Regions:
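N-terminal ligand-binding/catalytic initiation module
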Residues: 1-203, 433-442
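Conserved active-site and cofactor/substrate-binding residues in soluble primary-metabolism enzymes
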Residues: 2, 16-23, 27, 43, ...
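Glycine-rich phosphate/diphosphate-binding loop of Rossmann-like nucleotide-binding domains
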Residues: 193-196, 201-310
Length: 444
C-alpha cells in the first residue's frame, strides 16, 4: 500500500463520523501523489503526512450564556490550531448549527494550503460553535460572544492565533469578541481580523473574498485567452462573498444573473442589481423575496436551482458541497466555460472531476477564495505597524496577491505535468512551502 493510501485509511479510522474532514484530506493527498512519490521513503521516515493531517492542537469547550427569557443555554465551542510552520494560526470562526469538530477540522486543514498560497506568513487554523445567531437579539449575541471569548482568549494572541469571521460571524460578532478579549487580557492588539474601521479594521476587508475571487478568475481566463467582458455569470449565495463577487464581476464587464439564500434563489436576466441586493441583505437583513418584490425583471424560485441557469461562468459562493455531480452535468450541458469556488469546498469531488474531464476550467477555493485571508493578513500588518492604508492601496495589494497565487498555481501544475489542472497545482504549490518550513524546523 502506498504511503498516501496508508495515511488516508488512518484518518478515516481515527476520525470516524467526520466525512468533511475525510473528503478534504483525500482530495489534497490524492492530488499530491506525484510529489509524495518522489520523496516517499524520506516522508514516511519523518512521518511527514501524519504530522500534516493531525492538528497541532484541538480545543473543545462549553459556552454557557443567558437568553432574553433568563434561560441558560449551553453551546459547544471549537478551535483547531492545525499548523504553524509558516506563521501564527489564521482562520475564521463559524457560528452555525451544523458546526461540529469534523467540519472545523476540514476547514482548518484547507486553511493551511490556502494561507501558504498567499505568500504571507500565516499558518492554518479554524474555529466556531454550533450557536445560531439567526433570530437572536443583539444582547443574546453579545452574551454568547463574551462567553465564547472568555474561554478562547486563553489560546489566542496577535503572534499566536488570529481568528477572523466566517459564516454567522460578521462585524457585530467580531466587535463583541474583540471587546471581551481586550477586557480580559488588557491588551489592545490585532488578535482578531475583520474588525470595525474605528478599532483597527482594514478598508477593503469586507469586499476582499469576492473581489479576490474575480481577480483570480480573471487571471485564469486571461491565461486561457478568454475575456470576461460580456460573459453570463451564475453566482450562488447572497452573503459578503457573493455580493462583492457580483460587484467586481460587473466592474470587469461580466453579467451576473443569479444569487441565492437558504430558502430560494433569484434569476434576474437584466443582471443583478447589486445595490438593491446589498440593501436587502446587509441593511434590512431580509430574504431574497424582498429583492424580487422590488425588481420587476427578477424571478424568485424556492429551493435550489441556481445551476440550472445557462451561463458561461459559475461562482459557487454559498457553502460546502452545494455543487454536486448532477449540477455539474447541467452546467456542462449548458456550455459552462469556467467554475471558480468562492465558498470553502462548495464543489463535491465527483462534480470537480466531471467538470475537469469535460474541459471546464476549475479554480479551487483554497486558491480562488484566498482573498479574504490575504486581506486579513494585511490587516494584521497594519495593526502591528499602527498604520491604516487606503482602500485603493489594500485593493491593489489584494489584486497583486491573487494574480501571484494564480501564477504560482499555474506554474506548479505545469511543472508536474498537470497543465490547466488548478486543483493539483494549488495543492502542490501550497504543500511544498509548508513542507519546506516543517522540515527546516525539525520534528516538532
Amino acid at each position: 500500500m502506498s504511503y498516501v493510501d496508508e495515511v488516508i485509511d488512518l484518518i478515516v479510522k481515527e476520525n470516524p463520523d467526520e466525512p468533511e474532514f475525510h473528503q478534504a484530506v483525500k482530495e489534497v493527498l490524492e492530488s499530491l501523489r506525484v510529489v509524495i512519490e518522489e520523496n516517499e521513503e524520506q516522508y514516511r521516515k519523518d512521518a511527514l503526512l501524519e504530522r500534516l493531517v493531525n492538528p497541532e492542537r484541538q480545543i473543545k469547550f462549553r459556552v454557557p450564556w443567558v437568553d432574553d427569557n433568563g434561560q441558560v443555554q449551553v453551546n459547544t465551542g471549537y478551535r483547531v490550531q492545525f499548523n504553524s510552520a509558516i506563521g501564527p494560526y489564521k482562520g475564521g470562526l463559524r457560528f452555525h448549527p451544523s458546526v461540529n469538530v469534523g467540519i472545523i477540522k476540514f476547514l482548518g486543514f484547507e486553511q493551511i494550503f490556502k494561507n501558504s498560497l498567499t505568500g504571507l506568513p500565516i499558518g492554518g487554523g479554524k474555529g466556531g460553535s454550533n450557536f445560531d445567531p439567526k433570530g437572536k437579539s443583539d444582547r443574546e449575541v453579545m452574551a454568547f460572544c463574551q462567553s465564547f471569548m472568555t474561554e478562547l482568549c486563553k489560546y489566542i494572541g496577535a503572534d499566536t492565533d488570529v481568528p477572523a469571521g466566517d459564516i454567522g460571524v460578521g462585524g457585530r460578532e467580531i466587535g463583541y469578541l474583540f471587546g471581551q478579549y481586550k477586557r480580559l487580557q488588557g491588551l489592545y492588539e490585532g488578535v482578531l481580523t475583520g474588525k470595525g474601521l474605528t478599532f483597527g479594521g482594514s478598508l477593503a476587508r469586507t469586499e476582499a473574498t469576492g473581489y479576490g475571487l474575480l481577480y483570480f478568475t480573471n487571471a485564469m481566463l486571461k491565461a486561457n485567452d478568454i475575456d470576461i467582458a460580456g460573459k453570463t455569470i451564475a453566482v450562488s449565495g447572497a452573503g459578503n462573498v457573493a455580493i462583492y463577487a457580483i460587484q467586481k464581476a460587473q466592474q470587469l464587464g461580466g453579467k451576473p444573473v443569479t444569487c441565492s439564500d437558504s430558502t430560494g434563489w433569484i434569476y434576474d436576466p437584466e443582471g443583478i442589481d447589486v445595490e438593491l441586493l446589498k440593501e436587502v441583505k446587509e441593511v434590512r437583513r431580509e430574504r431574497l423575496t424582498a429583492y424580487a418584490e422590488a425588481r420587476p425583471s427578477a424571478e424568485y424560485h424556492e429551493g435550489k436551482g441556481v445551476w440550472t441557469v445557462k451561463c458561461d461562468i459559475a461562482l459557487p459562493c454559498a457553502t460546502q458541497n452545494e455543487l454536486q455531480l448532477e449540477d455539474a452535468k447541467t452546467l456542462v450541458a449548458n456550455g459552462v466555460t469556467a467554475v471558480a469556488e468562492g465558498a470553502n469546498m462548495p464543489t463535491t469531488i465527483e462534480a470537480t472531476e466531471y467538470l475537469q474531464e469535460n474541459g471546464v476550467l476549475f479554480a479551487p477555493g483554497k486558491a480562488s477564495n484566498a482573498g479574504g485571508v490575504a486581506t486579513s493578513a494585511l490587516e494584521m500588518s497594519q495593526n502591528s505597524q499602527r498604520l491604516s492604508w487606503t482602500f485603493e492601496e489594500v485593493d491593489s495589494r489584494l489584486q497583486t496577491i491573487m494574480e501571484n497565487i494564480f501564477a504560482n498555481v499555474d506554474a506548479a501544475a505545469k511543472d508536474y505535468g498537470f497543465e490547466k489542472n488548478y486543483v493539483v497545482g494549488a495543492n502542490i504549490a501550497g504543500f511544498l512551502k509548508v513542507v519546506d518550513a516543517m522540515n527546516a524546523q525539525g520534528i516538532v
